[in-house]
Amino acid sequence: MPVAIGALQRHATDHQMEHEVVSGKPLFARAADTGRHVAVVGAGPAGLACAHTLALSGHRVTIFDAHDKPGGLNEYGIAAYKTVDDFAQREVQWLLSIGGIELHARRQLGRDFALTQLREQFDAVFLGIGLGGINALHADGETLAGVLNAVDFIAQLRQSDDLSTLPVGHQVVVIGGGNTAIDAAVQSVKLGARQVTMAYRRGAAQMSATSAERDFARKQGVVLLEWARPLRIVGMLQAGSSDAHASAVQFETTRLDADGQLEGTGETFCIKADVVLKAIGQTLVSDGLDAQLLTLDGARIAVDADGATSLPGVWAGGDCTNHPALDLTVQAVQDGKLAAHAIIRQFARTVAKAG
């Protein structure tokens, strides 16, 4: 049986936070102020880990985040059924309690400030901006009523005080093969959907969702459909409305050709659906970045092993970067820590040269 690393980390963190409340003895103590000031863009796992590590070493940190609440995907991107005790905000407050970290909410890169400004005003910059864009399905009917982004669906659920008041489809089709697709599918079942199908264009072995997540979804009643890609979303006029609403999804069965490339078989079928949730990945939103100077690798920010970008004094980590690992919270946290230590070393070299 695989080791439940996430559950173990959750238990250890909860235990430590509770211990500090009882004992009054914090685990971490901040070093004396160094006079250095770092900007962190994004209050998700990568940004918070970077900020906390920098603050421990005595550097001041200002975090800018576009949302109302800090936490990133831990606050907005994990299904409500997995987060029953407001752990994301408790953990954020625990991290910020070390001191030396100032948080500015509702401050968005590209809208309220640009990377150029941060480079002028701070000694270093860390970008933990995640992936704010949504991949298009490129299928007819994508704009019909009832077709939603799974990420937005989950975020709405997480910020709702009463899940029973939220509308849910009777027949839901989730398109995608990652953990977001699993979350959206299972959450739909728990909200009362009669039939939930999760469709993926390849096989289970190619899904980024873990086998444990897939098994859990099946046990909850989700039907996992492999080797099926959406061709179009069928719309139908509803009584009292002039706008068409999703009523079914037409799929084509797929397979791998002799070269291992995905191809359609020409065989098609339809699944009824009054709600279609797209969970086919996210993209980098480059607004506010120095795109002409900041090197991108494909659709993400290119970084070295320490998280350094092509711009001097700018580091990045988490989902927005091109690291080869999976887009997991634990990887984002590690990215933030590694970048923070690289920034600390850079500051030390600067002091040594000045001396």
Label each residue range with its predicted role.
Residues M1-A12, T62, K69, G100-I101:
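Iron-sulfur cluster-binding cysteine motifs and their immediate structural context
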Residues L8, A12-A32, Q93-R106, R111, ...:
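Glycine-rich dinucleotide-binding loop and its adjacent helix/turn
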Residues A32-V41, Q89-A139, R232-Q250, V275, ...:
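Feature captures the FAD/FMN-dependent oxidoreductase FAD-binding
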Residues H37-T62, A181-V189:
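N-terminal Rossmann-like FAD-binding beta1-loop-alpha1 element of flavoenzymes
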Residues G44-P45, K69, G178-T180, T321:
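Residue-level detector of alpha-helix initiation sites
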Residues I63, H67-S97, L103-H104, A185-R232, ...:
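Rossmann-like dinucleotide-binding cores of NAD(P)H-dependent redox enzymes
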Residues T143-G169, D259-L326, V330:
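FAD-site-proximal beta/loop scaffold in flavoenzymes
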Residues A184, C320-V351:
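A conserved FAD-binding loop/helix module that cradles the flavin
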